[in-house]
Design a protein with these regions (language model features):
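Long, hydrophobic/aromatic-enriched structural stretches that serve as scaffold segments
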Residues: 68-134
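Terminal interaction module
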Residues: 1-91, 133-201
């Protein structure tokens, strides 16, 4: 499998997850991803690290079984009411400084990183970036974010339990991609947002 990046010569690393629902309905996957995104309920990965699935859409809106595009975003959810350390005074931050911190909008989160993914409904395969713009997403973090998002209790009644497993070997990814008749996966990094495109050769 030939993997290339357009508009950028930056390093690209990818991994994959196998995502299976019951029954195995390709049409059901887009509904599942879209419903999960609308919940806007982040997943706590570890400590103050959280993640979500965002920007879900079809690659080809006119194709019934089109691959699904999206992003996995991770960020830090800081407790603004905890004690803060002042590097200058080498002591607890002053009340004035802590007040400024508490006034930060709750919808803004630091240390954001996002990683594009593409999901093939017919093979249940999600290929996603694990390295982008010098930031990394471990496959275990990705698995937890995707699993917990798609298995949110608010979705279980409609979609049932979703099985999300790691595909450890790159050759397995190549094999599954070949099942769809795709010989080239071209990952295109746009200026405004990420876009994963497929090129048939």
């Amino acid at each position: 499998m030939n993997i290339s990046r357009e508009l950028s010569m930056k390093k690209l690393v990818h991994s994959a997850l196998n995502i299976v629902t019951h029954p195995h309905s390709p049409e059901n996957y887009l509904k599942l991803f879209s419903a999960a995104q609308k919940l806007e309920i982040p997943v706590r990965v570890r400590g103050e690290q959280y993640g979500s699935i965002i920007h879900v859409s079809k690659l080809d809106k006119d194709q019934k079984l089109s691959p699904i595009l999206g992003e996995i975003v991770k960020y830090t959810n800081i407790d603004k009411h905890s004690d803060w350390y002042d590097l200058v005074s080498k002591d607890v931050a002053s009340e004035e400084d802590q007040l400024k911190i508490k006034q930060l909008p709750d919808h803004l989160k630091p240390n954001m990183a996002r990683f594009s993914f593409i999901f093939f409904p017919d093979t249940h395969l999600m290929v996603f970036e694990t390295y982008c713009d010098s930031k990394t997403l471990s496959i275990n973090y990705a698995q937890k974010i995707v699993h917990d998002t798609l298995n949110n209790p608010l979705l279980l009644d409609k979609f049932g339990e979703v099985n999300v497993t790691v595909i450890p070997q790159t050759d397995q990814i190549d094999e599954l991609l070949n099942l769809t008749g795709l010989k080239t996966l071209r990952i295109i990094k746009g200026i405004v947002n990420n876009l994963l495109g497929i090129v048939n050769t």
